[in-house]
A protein has these predicted regions:
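Short glycine/acidic-enriched loop and turn motifs that connect beta-strands
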Residues: 13-17, 68-73, 120-123, 178-179, ...
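Beta-rich, blade/repeat-based domains predominating
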Residues: 16, 49-58, 98-109, 145-168, ...
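Asp-box/WD-like beta-propeller blade repeats and closely related beta-sheet repeat scaffolds
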Residues: 88-161
């Protein structure tokens, strides 16, 4: 196809407590024809356990995937090289998630650091990434604390995402279990995460995902347990978030 775009789809391959079925095969590659809208599966799936969240680096050279596994020792993060012509993935390496139910991965703009959120154990990790895309062992692991009023979903901390500020100086982890956004300073040269502050949100709200406005100092937060979008101000100098 002359005018196409490649899509990567992660699937659940193993059952987890929140799933009724898990019939997937791994990561699937599709080609989308931008002229006709036709979607075509381009290859056999890449075999990996529960690649429930995928992230591609800014220049499109690497794809990173979580393996969302409840067992602490089996979950992980994996790196793949992307063929620029075919979109095919080539496995590079994997590292342990250092927690259970890894659910979110993000990459800084230079591709030198990968950030991972573990929902089950409520912690976040950072991993240095080499020039060839190889993941090193985690350079930082931070355990969240706290709980919320929803006894079924908030019995403990549950880190649900970790995203970077537009300038990549700060990282923000939305913790569904503790009703907090935990902020960190990121040192991209070492992959270190330094805890800064915790923004306490409405009790029982269950913050899940955070995105920044592309040109303004605002962020938008989705709170899963109350189905709400919250507008936040962002101080690019200090990294502080405030509810508006």
């Amino acid at each position: 196809m002359s005018n196409s775009q490649y899509l990567y789809v992660g699937t659940y391959t193993r059952l987890a407590p929140h799933l009724e079925a898990a019939n997937g095969s791994g990561i699937h590659l599709y080609a989308l024809d931008l002229d006709t809208g036709a979607l075509r599966c381009n290859s056999e799936p890449i075999v990996i356990d529960n690649p429930s969240y995928l992230s591609i680096d800014k220049i499109g050279n690497r794809l990173f995937s979580v393996s969302e596994i409840e067992q602490h020792e089996e979950g992980g993060i994996s790196a793949y090289a992307i063929d620029p012509d075919s979109g095919a993935l080539t496995y590079i390496n994997s590292q342990q998630a250092n927690g259970s139910a890894a659910c979110y991965v993000s990459i800084n703009d230079t591709g030198s650091t990968a950030l991972l959120a573990n929902y089950g154990t409520g912690n976040v990790c950072s991993y240095p990434v080499a020039d060839n895309g190889e993941l090193s062992v985690a350079s930082a692991i931070h355990q969240h604390q706290g709980s919320g009023p929803n006894s079924e979903r908030q019995e403990a901390a549950h880190a649900h995402s970790i995203v970077l500020s537009p300038d990549n100086k700060f990282a923000f982890a939305a913790d569904l279990g503790s009703d907090q956004i935990i902020s960190y300073q990121l040192h991209s040269d070492t992959g270190q995460l330094l805890p800064l502050a915790a923004l306490q949100l409405q009790a029982g709200s269950g913050p899940r995902h955070l995105v920044f406005h592309p040109t303004q100092n605002f962020a938008f937060l989705i709170s899963e347990l109350i189905s709400q979008v919250t507008l936040l101000s962002y101080d690019a100098t200090s990294g502080e978030l405030r509810v508006l």
